[in-house]
């Protein structure tokens, strides 16, 4: 188990991982706060934050190498440049993921023997919203995703903003709202998007889900259909050009809102936790809480590695003078 906690005047940062029933943790997580300017000539810098979560593919070899490679490339891309929002279009993140993909593919071919290696990737980058050249008090969140690791936005009771492009919306039993921003790159989600799944009652009374897509047709019992969510149609490290497959979503975080990244080992059973949104937004030791949830999920039968990271927005933002060299 690996955990992290950091709190500043701007953000609370947490993450937690658990091996599950595996001997190797193929998940990798990165989280950090840094500084950003609105333009190259700006004399002030503002707080920003990033978290990255990668789930190395358990069905492929060396998933831990693949996930850590993506983390390293995204981290180095952000740390290696003092980002200004005037020029930022997300390409720096996409390029880093594509470069990591190239490294993983090259590594897989070393020694003349092809070895399959891959990973999911979800990145959340938070930076100040600029209105008429000044910080508005809200944060823009840019999310980049490929695979089935998820990004959720958690809304405080005072938050008025709702994402227009959320994949799904919900509330926990306390009334706290959350939005899932990312679409899973899974076969199940693909069939759902294509409206290819219908519920059918067979003559013997058995209930099945019929998948009909082009020339393919098959009936699945509920447990079989659920397994399709683990069949990925896109990830890092399997094909040469992945940049066009990377989802990019933009939303807004207000003070006291939060963001959660989760591997499938963590989100599989998240809906069974009735107060998770409130507990993450309002809890003091969220990394400890995430660890408790992971142990509960394992006791309920989860076998995969489990990982989650959280960024909570605090109410103030520290502005610093910038020295341009």
Which sequence ranges carry the predicted segments?
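PP2C/PPM-type serine/threonine phosphatase catalytic domain
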Residues: 1-325
């Amino acid at each position: 188990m690996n955990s992290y906690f950091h709190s500043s005047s701007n953000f609370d940062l947490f993450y937690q991982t658990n091996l599950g029933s595996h001997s190797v943790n193929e998940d990798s997580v990165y989280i950090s706060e840094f500084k950003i300017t609105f333009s190259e000539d700006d004399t002030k810098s503002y707080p920003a934050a990033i978290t990255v979560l990668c789930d190395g593919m358990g069905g492929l070899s060396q998933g831990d190498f693949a996930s850590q490679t993506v983390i390293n490339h995204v981290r180095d891309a952000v740390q290696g440049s003092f980002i200004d929002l005037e020029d930022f279009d997300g390409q720096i993140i996409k390029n880093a993921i594509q470069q990591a993909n190239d490294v993983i593919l090259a590594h897989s071919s070393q020694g003349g023997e092809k070895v399959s290696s891959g990973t999911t990737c979800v990145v959340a980058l938070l930076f100040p919203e600029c209105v008429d050249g000044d910080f508005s008090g809200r944060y823009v969140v840019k999310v980049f995703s490929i695979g089935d690791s998820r990004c959720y936005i958690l809304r405080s009771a005072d938050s008025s903003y709702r994402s227009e492009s959320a994949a799904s919306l919900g509330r926990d039993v306390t009334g706290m709202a959350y939005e899932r921003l990312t679409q899973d790159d899974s076969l199940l989600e693909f069939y759902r998007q294509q409206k290819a799944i219908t519920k059918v009652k067979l003559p013997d009374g058995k209930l099945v889900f019929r998948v009909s897509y082009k020339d393919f047709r098959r009936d699945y019992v509920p447990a079989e259909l659920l397994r399709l969510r683990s069949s990925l149609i896109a990830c890092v490290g399997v094909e040469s050009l992945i940049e066009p497959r990377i989802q990019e979503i933009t939303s807004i975080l207000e003070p006291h809102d939060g963001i959660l990244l989760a591997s499938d080992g963590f989100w599989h059973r998240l809906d069974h936790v009735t107060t998770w949104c409130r507990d993450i937004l309002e809890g003091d030791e969220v990394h400890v809480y995430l660890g408790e949830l992971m142990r509960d999920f394992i006791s309920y039968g989860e076998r995969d590695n489990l990982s989650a990271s959280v960024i909570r927005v605090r109410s103030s933002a520290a502005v610093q003078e910038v020295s341009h060299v």
